[in-house]
Amino acid sequence: MAYKIKKVNRGVERRDYRKVSGNLELPNLIEIQTKTFEWFKTKGIDEVLNEFFAMSSNDASASLFLEGWEIKEAKISPSKAKEQSKIYDAPIYVDLQLMFTKTEDISKEFEEIVEKDVKKVLSNWIAEKTDSKNVSLVKNTDNIYFFDVKLKGTEKNDLFQITILEEKEDIIVAEVSVRKWGQVFFGDFPLMTDAGTFVINGSQKVIVSQLVRSPGSYFKTEINNKTGESLYNGDIIPSRGTWLEFETDTKKTAETTNSLFVKIDKSRKTTATSFLKILGLDRDTILNIYDKDKVIVETLKNDNDTGDTYADWAQHVQEIYKKIRQGETATSDGASKYINGLLFDRRKYDLTKAGRFKLQQKLAVKNRLMGRILAEDIVDASGKILVAKNTEISKANIKEVSDALSQDGVMVSSIEYREDIPGSRQIQKVKVYQDNNSKDETFTIVGITPNSKEEHITVVDIVATVSYLLGLEYNIGEYDDIDNLANRRVRTVGELLQNQFRMGLTRIDKNVKEKLSTSDLYKVKVSTIINAKPLTAVIGEFFNLSQLSQFMDQINPLAELTNKRRLTALGPGGLSRDRASLEVRDVHPSHYGRICPIETPEGPNIGLINNLSTYAIVDELGFIRTPYLKVIDGVIQNEHEYLSADEEKEYIISQSNVTKDENGKILDETVVSHYKGDDYIAKVSEVQFIDVSPKQIVSVATSAIPFLENDDANRALMGANMQRQAVPTIVPESPFVGTGIEFEAARDSGVCIVATENGIVKYVDAKQITVESKAGIKTYTLANFERSNNGSSIVQKPIVKVGDSIEAGQIIADGPSVDNGELALGQNVVVAFTTYNGYNFEDAIVMSERVIMEDKFTSVHIDEYVLEVRNTKQGAEEITSEIPNISDNAKKYLDNEGIVAIGTEVKTGDILVGKVTPKGQTQLSPEDKLLHAIFGEKSRSVKDNSLKVPNGGEGIVQSVKRFKAKSAANPDGIDLPADVLEVIKVYIVQKRKIQEGDKMSGRHGNKGIISKVLPVEDMPHLEDGTPVDILLNPQGIPSRMNIGQILEIHLGMAAKKLGVKIATPVFEGVNSNDLDEIMAEAGMENYGKVKLIDGQTGEAIDKPISVGVMYMLKLSHMVDDKLHARSVGPYSLITQQPLGGKAQNGGQRFGEMEVWALEAYGAAHTLREILTIKSDDLKGRTKTYEAIVRSKNIPTPGTPESFNVLSKEIMGLGFDIYLLDNKGNKSQINAYDDDNDLINDESMKHASIDKLTFEDSISLVEIEDLDSFEEVDESEINLSFEEE
């Protein structure tokens, strides 16, 4: 039988049925978080600081230089930060040097100096200027003096260098150069934990990576609807800054030839040649560069030049400036400076390394030569011919031509443009024939030189982009597919944080300029020049408010892992849900091995939120790469290479399920491959690479579904998503039928404790594990009953013993939903596919009581309740058990201080912490004064503000944590907000057994609700007496096509009988032959169908039934969280109708359509009751309550409050509205007499609205009797006031 025994962790073994996967280990699955944050800490911050320093004053006389920077140690540990609701962060300090030079007239008139000694004069002048008494001369030459000056509160002395320019009778004219040093606090920066998360205000957060369009140049074509000819567009898009959009268009004046236009930042279009002219290229240069291309010649005609180069330049600059600034005018020099700033200033225009890489790839000459015939020799700088004229460039010789063109100086010429514009001045030009057949017309391909490095746009880039656009007409160059992953890149945590850091420094830069220009620089300390508040504000806003900063999905380890590996196309600078087209959401060939085609949310975000595939990594430029094994002459090599979507296009890559011998030689003659994004049947000799594993195309969650290959993709999507909602059970159990990825998923999720080095276990208990290694003794602390973001309980259990030898990377303690180092999201249960008296109609699940009694799906949930003790204007609040108007019985669980005892079982409404708040000062009554005199205690005027158990919060008090504010009296306290004296957190734990109404699912998208829990004796059982745990409806399978679950139950039953665990990796695991063999080994017959006996009748069910073991999950949609009833609760302030929703303890909304239903049945009394006393008849509902309590008849309902709201609304329009009774007298709405009943006046018996009258005697509607009621147009009067 074709399997290997795979040791997973601590002696756990699985039969591994994989057939083709190589030996390539999975990369660290959370590398996308940890690696990029490490880059940000070491290089990212450095890049930004070097970009902004030196900072100068407005007149550039004073400058701040960067000397160095460091991130100090974190103030508290991540666990302490969680406990105290703090941020896990560390301070950043930057060392700066301030330099400035001024020319000063130094007076010699110092009273105490009799002989005018220059040294003393200068020394006294410095002392006066700096308010410092510590001025000492270091050294001096002929007329240069160096002084050391110690300012109060600075570590390093200031250095004054005074050069005497001229000495007169009473003054010295000198140049004063000053250097000051100082360390500036740049704020606290959140740090990443080892698990790839941030602790922000006590909660774990994850920064989701963003998938955005890569900077670079993009080309497309469209058909002009009027003329039917092709128009070409080319854009240069930066990461930050101005967009340039080139397009060809037919001007009305010209007959046929297109002209070329450009739009700068979506402004009105202008001719591309006038744009090139303002950059300093003259008419002849432009014609020379493009070899008098017909489109360029036509475009130049539209420029209306006079022939005077400077005048034409000034005119074009001002015209373009007007278009960008929408009609504003400026001098030609001012306009030119503005336009140059937009494009060539590194601070305003950022192409990034990725953008330069894409431009280099797109605009290089060598990348446009494929399939063309050269119209000239390619020669090097000395004139030696490298490639001869008339050579056709094909796949065979493209590498040779590329190598030739990559050499320095090959086919390179220089262009001249404005001196004040930075960047390369060299272009590469190669002539090819426009048409390979006729060879009469040539086209000059103009490109950038192979060694451009600038991270801003250059004139050469613009020139080459225009050339690319012109070549498209002759099929030279390619159009871009913006959905290809070659054109999309990932902004990871590091880059997102670097961008925020840059934004903060931009704000600081403005403040520093102002401060350097206005401060007295002699007295200023370097540490006071920079205020880091703008930076910390930007960072704080990002972590707290950004769309990309999310609460970590902490239901189970898989949810955590997926959250860290998620890619979103939404967020700032990304797409928006409403405008995203189907093409963007769709699966693209370039996703192969990079983005999972299956795991994505259902609903409006489908296709916009994706997940990295299992082997995918993100490179330093942000492009996603996937590994392939090399194939040479049909033999698979043992070395792999990570390829980007761009590089992959050039190779023929085979799928991994080829037949091969033990040496890796492929035995098939032809293999299914992909080439240039399409399927391709290749000869073995053509294949260059092969997939490393069949699971490389799917994500971690998807690859955890066994028999994925037998499931419909829609159901697999649900299966992958629902695994993330599985609640950890008390005793986790790993699946009998796994896929082999369970260990890696658990190890990298961050919930387990993983050994960092080899060693021997010296001590183990429930709180810590001590390991002795070569580096010394290391203690690992275990989490015990900690609350996760989702309210589940985090408990880590040691799985090693004292004396065990462990290796680095081994799991030594399981987390939630982990069993012996393997992911264990659910439980293995015996499942039968049969109906049961209609109880499993519509996917409902029938369950045996045995499952509940054995606590298989019991989970633990922890809720946190927080109480703050504040200092109010009336005085400090107090924690006490002496709460006014509360019985002793209600306080029996409180200790002397008023805090509930740990271990107490509490119900809704019970007091957890007694707290009283002082009311305003009140005058004591004579009785109070008497009591006070007798008992000597103040009868306190306080209000009960205790913390009580909310609706549905009952459980057992697990722990209580108290945090007192730091003060002189309490130096060990923690920093709390102003006015908060103490924070008390009470944790209540609930043990939830599975019950009717809970949602369950398998791993194949087969979900349902438990409809019935049956006693064990009523459940069907096998002939040997084995009771079935769960009954599923067989009708749920055919239409959904998730056949994987059938294979899983048969394999699961076989595994249970054999007492083994099995790994069947996706696309390469157990096939039908293997399954037959395993079932035969386990002694199973009849394709796994068995005779099932009805527990109630004891008779066998007619037909054999499929029974097996399935891995089932309990999902986090539990009936306890959803079921809700209201007896007494809050009302809306305006309409006085009950609020809605469980959180508000609200009522059921009886809306417009429900009213129609009762009207249809003519249930008038019920309807009146619902719309009045059960809703918003204020007095009526009070009277009704009294009547019920006193066993009286329920009074007649009054007028609902919504009618009052309506009448007030009408009054607001300027009308006076009131009720008239039968006799024409005004009457009050909702008038009650003293007998607790409605007024018994005959005329008001029904409190009906007989006439609505307005002061201006316009009668809106008259209701004389019920017959006339039908004539009223319903659209004119609508007295129902509803609140969503």
UniProtKB/Swiss-Prot annotation:
Disulfide bonds: none annotated. One of its GO terms (biological process) is DNA-templated transcription. Its EC number is 2.7.7.6. One of its GO terms (cellular component) is DNA-directed RNA polymerase complex. The keyword Amino-acid biosynthesis does not apply. Pfam families: RNA_pol_Rpb2_1 (PF04563), RNA_pol_Rpb2_2 (PF04561), RNA_pol_Rpb2_3 (PF04565), RNA_pol_Rpb2_45 (PF10385), RNA_pol_Rpb2_6 (PF00562), RNA_pol_Rpb2_7 (PF04560). Keywords: DNA-directed RNA polymerase, Nucleotidyltransferase, Transcription, Transferase. The keyword Transcription applies. It catalyses: RNA(n) + a ribonucleoside 5'-triphosphate = RNA(n+1) + diphosphate. CDD domains: RNA_pol_B_RPB2. One of its GO terms (molecular function) is ribonucleoside binding. DNA-dependent RNA polymerase catalyzes the transcription of DNA into RNA using the four ribonucleoside triphosphates as substrates. PANTHER family: DNA-DIRECTED RNA POLYMERASE I SUBUNIT 2 (PTHR20856). The RNAP catalytic core consists of 2 alpha, 1 beta, 1 beta' and 1 omega subunit. When a sigma factor is associated with the core the holoenzyme is formed, which can initiate transcription. Belongs to the RNA polymerase beta chain family. This is DNA-directed RNA polymerase subunit beta. It comes from Mesoplasma florum (strain ATCC 33453 / NBRC 100688 / NCTC 11704 / L1).
